[in-house]
């Protein structure tokens, strides 16, 4: 009897291990996929479990707070994009998986924006579309093209998923084209359509390889060249005209030149020494609209190289002084009477630095006065 107890314990443990193994490795039911609108409230039931069943909810492997539960149901309010994920409901005691929901939060589509353009005239045209706002969930688009009552094939672009191409069946047709597009997702659908004449959607791609160069010895000229867009299939039969605009970087106002033919132009009124920005657009000679502007080219008109002048070394300046033969202006000095002796005779004024003849004349005049 004592020996049977260990055997019983082993049997229980083996059964438990088998149950755990079976739970982990048995194939599980694929999760239910559910789409809900952004901002809405949603209630997720725990599969077929009763309302009062003891369950635990997880999202992406993380336990959810019990206050989000109403019985066994999970309540999510004011859905945000972050609520998207894999929700799983487990039996609280055995952790047996009861139910899974893969929740996607998004929006129904708004009216799509549709446009058509022929940049390969006369081969065909393409139509492209997009939604004005994202839906955050997968969308399906369906395009229908009619030429009168005839349905035309719209071949999907291999690189751009929101574009398809249509070949012209009849050139210069007066019958209008009608293009319709519908979009749908799990939360709703929408449609739009446009009608147009063949010639109204012709719009070439911008000119290519726009290059601007200075003209040697011409400080106000720039030579501009470009190429016809490579997507334009037959420029000989369907020639293009061009529109050139240019301005110095220091100004905001453009100058324009329309050219009926050719792929080159010389600007003759550029500001000397100022950098310029140049762009070119293209248009069919007869129909359609102007292309977008090309990639900008930059150039500065020719400027003369500064000259480096070599000069001979200047000789050091020499100062030549000459002595004037004229004596400097005389200075007058009144002699001190004490220097003339102690006699009581009249004082005699001596002018120093005065020519001798003047001194002698003054002495003679004094003597005559004494004799009188």
Curated annotation (Swiss-Prot):
Lipidated positions per record (GPI-anchor amidated serine): 342
Protein name listed in UniProt: Ciliary neurotrophic factor receptor subunit alpha
Similarity field: Belongs to the type I cytokine receptor family. Type 3 subfamily.
Keywords annotated in UniProt: Cell membrane, Disulfide bond, Glycoprotein, GPI-anchor, Immunoglobulin domain, Lipoprotein, Membrane, Receptor, Repeat, Signal
Entry-linked PANTHER family: CILIARY NEUROTROPHIC FACTOR RECEPTOR SUBUNIT ALPHA (PTHR23036:SF21), CYTOKINE RECEPTOR (PTHR23036)
Residues cleaved off as propeptide: 343-372
Residue ranges of domain Ig-like C2-type in the record: 27-104
Highest classification ranks of the organism: Eukaryota, Metazoa, Chordata, Craniata, Vertebrata
Matches recorded under InterPro entries: FN3_dom, FN3_sf, Hematopoietin_rcpt_L_F3_CS, Ig-like_dom, Ig-like_dom_sf, Ig-like_fold, Ig_sub, Ig_sub2
Signal peptide (UniProt feature, chain positions): 1-22
Keyword Disulfide bond: yes
Disulphide bridges, residue numbers: 46-89
Organism: Mus musculus (Mouse)
Subunit structure and binding partners: Forms a heterotrimer with LIFR and IL6ST. Interacts with heterodimeric neurotropic cytokine composed of CLCF1/CLC and CRLF1/CLF-1. Either alone or in complex with the heterodimer CLCF1-CRLF1 interacts with SORL1; this interaction may promote internalization and lysosomal degradation.
Function recorded in the entry: Binds to CNTF. The alpha subunit provides the receptor specificity.
Domain notes: The WSXWS motif appears to be necessary for proper protein folding and thereby efficient intracellular transport and cell-surface receptor binding.
Top-level taxon of the source organism: Eukaryota
Subcellular location(s) per record: Cell membrane
Designated gene of the protein: Cntfr
Domain Fibronectin type-III: 108-205, 206-306
Membrane-topology descriptor: Lipid-anchor; GPI-anchor
GO CC field: apical plasma membrane; ciliary neurotrophic factor receptor complex; CNTFR-CLCF1 complex; side of membrane
Biased composition (Low complexity): 311-326
């Amino acid at each position: 009897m004592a020996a049977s107890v260990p055997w019983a314990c082993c049997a229980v443990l083996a059964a438990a291990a088998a149950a755990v193994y079976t739970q982990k490795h048995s194939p599980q039911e694929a999760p239910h996929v559910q789409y809900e609108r952004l901002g809405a409230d949603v209630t997720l039931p725990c599969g077929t479990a009763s309302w009062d069943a003891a369950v635990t909810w997880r999202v992406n492997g993380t336990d959810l707070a019990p206050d989000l539960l109403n019985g066994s149901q999970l309540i999510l309010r004011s859905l945000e994009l972050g609520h998207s994920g894999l929700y799983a409901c487990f039996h609280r005691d055995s952790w047996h998986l009861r139910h899974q929901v893969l929740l996607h939060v998004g929006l129904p589509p708004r009216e799509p924006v549709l446009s058509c353009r022929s940049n390969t005239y006369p081969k065909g045209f393409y139509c492209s579309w997009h939604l004005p706002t994202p839906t955050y969930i997968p969308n399906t688009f369906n395009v229908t093209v009619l030429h009168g009552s005839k349905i035309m094939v719209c071949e999907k672009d291999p690189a751009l998923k929101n574009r398809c191409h249509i070949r012209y069946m009849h050139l210069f047709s007066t019958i209008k084209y009608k293009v319709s597009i519908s979009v749908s997702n799990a939360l709703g659908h929408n449609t739009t359509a446009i009608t147009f004449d063949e010639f109204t959607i012709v719009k070439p791609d911008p000119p290519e390889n726009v290059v601007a160069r200075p003209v040697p010895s011409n400080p106000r000229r720039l030579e501009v060249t470009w190429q016809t867009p490579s997507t334009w299939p037959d420029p000989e039969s369907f020639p293009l005209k061009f529109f050139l605009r240019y301005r110095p970087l220091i100004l905001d106002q453009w100058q324009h030149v329309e050219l009926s033919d050719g792929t080159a132009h010389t600007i003759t009124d550029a500001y000397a020494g100022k950098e310029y920005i140049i762009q070119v657009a293209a248009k069919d000679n007869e129909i359609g609209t102007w292309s977008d502007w090309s990639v900008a080219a930059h150039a500065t008109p020719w400027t003369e190289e500064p000259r480096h002048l070599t000069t001979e070394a200047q000789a050091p300046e020499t100062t030549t002084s000459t002595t004037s033969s004229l004596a400097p202006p005389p200075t007058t000095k009144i002699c001190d009477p004490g220097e003339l002796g102690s006699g009581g005779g009249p004082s005699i004024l001596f002018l120093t630095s005065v020519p001798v003849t003047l001194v002698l004349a003054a002495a003679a005049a004094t003597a005559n006065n004494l004799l009188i």
